[in-house]
UniProtKB/Swiss-Prot annotation:
Keywords: Plasmid. Signal peptide: none annotated. GO terms for molecular function: ATP binding; DNA binding; hydrolase activity. It holds the Pfam family ResIII. This is Uncharacterized protein MJECL28. The keyword Cell membrane does not apply. It comes from the Archaea.
């Protein structure tokens, strides 16, 4: 900054004549010269301006400067300045000929600046002369691109970064045919210049443009596209034009004329003030200091983070809007943007909605007008007075209102931002976004006696920790729950008249102690009997069976009715929730000679509710039963709520007695939080790996969704999962083998997979060892914790799945008490809140929103006794708990914190890849030889031959596979697994196998001999050995042929198709292997196909069959009929679009001679098309099929395979063989036959590998499966 500024002008707010004179004398300010300016002087000004601009570009290209806080920009800028290739000169107006010229500046340096300047001057003069010769012409002016171009284009895609900064001040009164006077120009110059000086900034030059003034600043580095919004903010602050800040902007050249017709005669665009010495031109402006002086950026660190994290990834995508949004966070000036509005939706949007409703009730429908007046915001009425238009709220471009507010129903007033029409939001949210308005909005609310209550929204973490940390009455114990704890709980319940929670770890014998000590407990309180309620029938049966084993038979009540025995006792009754009222009635009354006699009052009955957390968690689908339990709790003489997990459900803050046990409990060996993008796919992938490798024998999985269980079961069966799968739901309890074992033996099967809903998490015991316990899907954190505790003796591995989150954000919900108040105040607003909040949870379950919203309908009910509407707070507690627990299960960090606090386990956060790798690494360390046998034969051979056993052993132990460079890819555990069951289908292995001494054993492994029955090869060891001997003989023959130049003397086998048939016995070994492997490759390609395997087969058969004129021929395993059927199905469906299944069956039968079944038609259609099939169950073959479009996966595969297989590039195996036989005069070497087939198979394999790479992106698992039709 120049001395004269810092010493004499810096502190002055108003300029006096002496100060102005000092500046003018120092810095060559000349206004009077513009009135009689000559062409020579104007040309000199043009040369100086262009030379300064070129010097600046050279400076930026060779060595630009960055501020201390901007070191992160250096990498970005270096990349940009390399793209400074062209300077655009543009002529604007109406004339014939070229208007854009691009000067090559790629070789620009200090020594050729003057040469380039002269080149530009000559170009401008030449174009001037050319335009003057035209009779019909109108030239507006000559312009230069502020940003150098990387291509010969003038759009934003070719622009790089601004080389200088310009602020244009348009003066409306100058835009007439009257030239402004010297005094008028001086007045405006002083006015605008003083705004810069007050900020301690001095422009490098000022130019008169004809209709205003331009202030030019030379920065020490290029100005990035993202920074233009900052310049726009400064321009708005200065009162300059804000519409010029786009990257491709062209600026009127200083030293030329402004030819606009409204001026009457041309006006010079000329420098009137050079405020920097020519020799000091290198003293350039630091951009971030400019932003700081004008108060635009709050701190440098955020500015640095912006470019460090955001710029690099968004620059290539030209994501200016996203970057601008981030910049807006750093700007102190009011500015509305989508990102911050998204934050509002999560945090206070719902609160603002309630405030609008209160304002409408208090001030009427047009409250918004009063608020705008209070905030000092000017507005105008739009059409019919239903709209308010606001200017200068965010940006004033002088054309459109900045935004409009549509009044509608007052509380639903909507604001629309005209700078981004997609942004629509409630009016109060838009005003609240401007920080300067918030205090005044609060003042306005208090002025009208409206309590804003902005603190009623809290983070889920805060609420969760508050509930977990509540004080409890602690009792110490060892082993099992003492009866004194139960007596203490009943005593507290009777004294306070409220139910009391008895908290004890699962597996500590809560129900055992209660049911075995009933007589003593009831006698302490002089009560008649105790009734114990359980959520499920399975628990009633399990407890009843235990008592029966001890010689005690009790009345048992469950869904099917009452079940009594002659020798039952009458001081203890057990039953399910829905039978509690029946239990109380039967305990209070007895029947004598057909008459009902009361033997006790309800106050004489003690009630115990097992798994009491279900009273809150399960209310949405067990409303009637739980409502009956709640009524009985109020009627009974005392109530104890038994649970191990009362924390998140105890919203009413009932007393809690917590029993702490001193002895150590058995833990799981490993505990993980699994972050899943594809829950079913990743689960199936891991389960298949674990069971197939023999690493686990049994697994218990919580899947609280019956449809998901069906999908998992179907998927696993599709993949060839051959272990027993047991499904336990409420309907199958006591019926299937697994649930019977749990009830009667407290064990799960030693082998197999158990998929269970939440019924397994309630009161059951699993006392044998479980290799894998997995909470896969459940929207209740309490239920997950209960499920984990079912395994009384721990287990091998514990996994809890949480969905993957793209955005890391702290979830928030309204405070519980505030929620009740909101409900009382306005039911409609609570519904709005829930609909907004549940939108966050939509990934959990599509029906979840509907379920919760339906509960609101019953939260307020009409009480016939009170003759008034009553709020059911239990219903609100259920809704609130559901939201709270769903947020916890959806956020893996919250879930980890909750489980670690409540279980005592330590959980590691892992993806499915990390889960598999950790398991593989541990296994390889101790079982490398066993795992080596499962590796693909091809890689075993290469590794053994080249490196030996010891090298393989070291590689597997130390996880270092780089040395296996001869393998197709890097030799990693993932690659080993990928090829372990696929390479066996490639006949290429036969080339290498014979070199291995243990050939029989390796080849047995290659063919999976002795493994799954359905995958056994028909080849025995003798056959393989014979085959290998033949191959050795063929190799000798080939060697002889190569050594002998005369082909006539070569020893060959004369083979044609007939001869091959005649010598079938002699050559059967090799032929059988070739045919078997070809069939496997064609019908079961060497990739693991999953749920879209039908699509793959459909595509393959259509592609390979499309150009074949002999579709009915079959040789070497080609299934031509399949292709013919598929092609006809596709063509028929595309042509008809809508048809009955029967019509398609008839066409295929007539033209292909093959009758399709109903299931085959459905599989074919769904494989090829995105379609709707209506009424299949009812109408059968008369069901209507409506085709929409080709299946997306079908399209993708079709393109891949079609590009690689066509009649021109690859012919069918039989064609190739026939052609080869014909070329050899009816003879062919068996080795040649072998090589032909190998080459064909290899090509097919490569095609499917390409398809597989595409399919991997879908995130599904693949496994071979029988084809679409019976003939495949």
């Amino acid at each position: 900054m120049n001395n004269i500024l810092s010493n004499s002008i810096k502190s002055l707010r108003y300029w006096d004549d002496q100060t102005v004179k000092a500046i003018f004398d120092k810095y060559q300010i000349n206004v009077s010269g513009i009135y009689n300016i000559s062409d020579d002087i104007l040309e000199s000004d043009l040369k100086l301006h262009i030379a300064q601009l070129l010097f600046l570009i050279v400076k930026h290209k060779e060595e630009f400067s960055v501020y201390l806080g901007e070191t992160h920009l250096e990498k970005i800028l270096k990349k940009l300045v390399k793209q400074f290739k062209y300077l655009e000169i543009r002529f604007l107006g109406k004339f014939k000929g070229k208007k854009q010229f691009f000067i090559d500046i790629s070789d620009l340096h200090v020594d050729n600046i003057l040469e380039k300047t002269e080149e530009i001057i000559k170009l401008i003069k030449k174009q001037y002369e050319y335009i003057k010769k035209q009779k019909k012409r109108r030239l507006d002016g000559v312009y230069v691109g502020i940003a150098p171009r990387k291509e010969k284009r003038g759009d934003a895609g070719a622009a790089t970064a601004w080389s200088y900064i310009a602020f244009d001040f348009d003066v409306e009164e100058w835009k007439t045919n009257k030239m402004p006077t010297e005094e008028e120009i001086m007045e405006k110059l002083i006015k605008y210049l003083s705004k810069f000086v007050e900020k301690d900034i001095l422009p490098h030059k000022v130019a008169f443009t004809g209709g205003g003034l331009r202030f030019i600043l030379y920065p020490e580095r290029p100005i990035l596209e993202e920074e233009l919004i900052l310049l726009r903010m400064i321009a708005e602050d200065l009162g300059a034009d804000i519409a010029m800040y786009d990257l491709a902007r062209v600026d009127r050249l200083v030293g030329t004329y402004n030819y606009k017709e409204k001026y009457g005669s041309p006006r010079p665009c000329v420098t009137i003030a050079q405020l920097t010495d020519e020799e000091d031109i290198e003293k350039l402006l630091t951009p971030i200091i400019l932003y700081e002086k004008f108060g635009i950026i709050e701190n440098y660190k955020e500015f640095e983070v912006l470019f460090n994290e955001k710029r690099e990834e968004l620059y290539n995508k030209r994501g200016l809007n996203n970057i601008t949004t981030t910049i807006n966070r750093l700007i102190k000036k009011p500015n509305l943007n989508k990102t911050i509005l998204q934050d509002i939706n999560k945090r206070i949007y719902k609160w603002l909605y309630t405030i609008q409703d209160k304002l409408t009730k208090k001030l009427g429908k047009r409250w918004i007008e009063k608020l705008l007046s209070y905030l000092g915001i000017d507005y105008k009425y739009g059409k019919n007075g239903t709209r308010l238009d606001l200017w200068s709220l965010f940006f004033d471009d002088g054309k459109n209102p900045d935004c409009s507010i549509y009044i509608n129903e007052g509380y639903n007033a909507v604001m629309v931002d005209f700078h981004d029409p997609n942004m629509r939001f409630i009016a109060l949210a838009g005003l609240w976004m401007i920080k300067e308005f918030r205090d005044k909005i609060i003042e306005f609310l208090k002025l009208h006696n409206i309590n804003p209550k902005p603190s009623t929204y809290r983070t889920v973490r805060e609420i969760m920790n508050e509930l977990l940390d509540r004080e409890t009455i602690k009792i110490e114990a060892e082993g099992y729950l003492p009866k004194e704890a139960i007596i203490k709980a009943y005593q507290l319940s009777i004294e306070q008249g409220v139910p009391v929670f008895l908290k004890a770890d699962t597996g500590r014998g809560k129900t055992y102690t209660l049911t075995r000590n009933t007589r003593e407990i009831k006698e302490v309180f002089k009560k008649h009997a105790i009734a114990v309620a359980f959520p499920y029938k399975i628990q009633v049966l399990q407890v009843g069976a235990g008592l029966h084993a001890d010689g005690v038979v009790v009345p048992m009540y469950y869904e099917d009715g009452k079940k009594l025995d002659k020798n039952t006792i009458h001081y203890l009754t057990i039953g399910t929730y829905d039978q509690v009222e029946n239990m109380l009635n039967d305990l209070c009354y007895d029947t004598y000679k057909g008459e009902k006699i009361q033997v006790a009052n309800e106050e004489d009955i003690l009630l115990a509710i097992d798994e009491a957390h279900d009273l809150v968690i399960q209310k949405e689908f067990r409303k009637r039963a739980i409502t009956g339990v709640k009524k009985c709790i109020d009627r009974a003489g005392g109530c104890v709520l038994l649970t191990a997990t009362p924390e998140l459900i105890n919203l009413n803050n009932y007393p809690v007695i917590e029993v702490e046990f001193k002895d150590e409990k058995k833990l799981f060996e490993r505990c993980s939080i699994h972050i899943a993008k594809n829950i079913i796919g990743e689960f199936c992938e891991y389960i298949l790996l674990m069971f197939r490798q023999g690493w686990i024998k049994n697994a218990v999985v919580l899947v609280d969704n019956k449809k998901m269980i069906e999908n998992i079961k179907y998927t696993l069966e599709l993949y060839g999962f051959n272990k027993p799968i047991y499904v336990i739901t409420r309907e199958t309890v006591g019926i299937d083998k697994a649930s019977k074992m749990i009830i009667n033996e407290e064990k799960v099967p030693e082998e197999g997979l158990i998929l269970a809903t939440r019924v397994i998490s309630e009161g059951v015991n699993i006392k044998n060892h479980v290799d894998l316990v997995w909470a896969l899907y459940c929207k209740s954190a309490t239920t997950i914790r209960q499920f984990i505790a079912r395994c009384r003796n721990g287990g091998g591995e514990l996994i809890v799945t949480a969905p993957f989150k793209e955005r890391e954000e702290e979830p928030m919900i309204i405070d519980y008490n505030a929620m009740i108040e909101m409900f009382k105040e306005n039911y409609k607003l609570l519904k709005e809140y829930l609909e907004t909040d549940i939108e966050v949870l939509k990934e959990l379950d599509k029906n979840y929103k509907k379920v919760l919203i339906s509960q609101i309908q019953n939260a307020i009910y009409y009480d016939e006794e009170k003759k008034d509407w009553v709020l059911d707070e239990d219903e609100i507690a259920h809704i609130y708990n559901s939201l709270l627990e769903a947020h916890i299960t959806r956020d893996y960090k919250l879930l980890k914190e909750y489980l670690e606090k409540t279980t005592g386990y330590e959980f590691a956060i892992k993806t499915i890849k990390e889960l598999k790798e950790s398991k593989l690494d541990k296994f390889l360390k101790y079982n490398y030889l066993e795992y080596l046998e499962k590796v693909s034969a091809k890689h075993i051979i290469i590794a053994f031959k080249e490196y030996g056993v010891n090298e393989i052993k070291n590689a597997l132990e130390y996880n270092n596979y780089k040395k296996f460079k001869d393998c197709r890819d890097e030799y990693t555990p993932q690659l080993i697994k990928k090829h372990s069951k696929r390479i066996n289908r490639s006949i290429n292995v036969l080339k290498d196998v014979y070199n291995i001494p243990e050939v029989i054993e390796v080849y047995n492994l290659m063919l999976n001999k002795g493994k799954d029955d359905d995958k056994k090869s028909n080849l025995d060891e003798n056959t393989i050995k014979k085959c290998l001997e033949e191959i050795n003989e063929y190799k000798k023959i080939v060697k002889e042929i190569n050594e002998n130049e005369d082909r006539k003397t070569k020893k060959i086998y004369h083979i044609d198709l007939k001869l091959l048939e005649e010598h079938k016995d002699k050559l059967s070994t090799l032929a059988r292997i070739i045919e078997e492997l070809i069939l496997k490759t064609f019908l079961c390609p060497p990739s693991k196909w999953g749920k879209i395997q039908r699509i793959i087969r459909a595509v393959w058969n259509i592609v390979v069959g499309e150009d074949d004129e002999r579709l009915d021929r079959r040789k070497l395993g080609l299934r031509s009929l399949v292709a013919k059927v598929l092609i006809k199905v596709r063509d028929f469906a595309i042509e008809r679009q809508k048809f009955k299944i029967r019509e398609l069956i008839e066409v295929i039968k007539e033209e292909c001679g093959f009758t399709l079944t109903l299931d085959e038609v459905r599989r074919l259609i769904r494989a090829i098309f995105n379609c709707v099939i209506r009424g299949v169950k009812k109408l059968g073959e008369n069901a209507v099929v409506e085709i929409k479009e080709l299946n997306k996966e079908f399209k993708t595969l079709y393109e891949i395979i079609k590009q690689n297989i066509n009649s021109n590039s690859v012919e069918k195996c039989e064609k190739v063989i026939e052609k080869k036989i014909e070329e050899n005069g009816g003879e062919i070497l068996e080795m040649e036959l072998y090589e032909l087939i190998v080459e064909k198979l290899k090509f097919v394999e490569e095609v499917f590998y390409k398809a597989l790479e595409k399919l991997k992106k879908l995130g599904v698992i693949y496994e071979p499966k029988p084809g679409l039709l019976r003939i495949t």
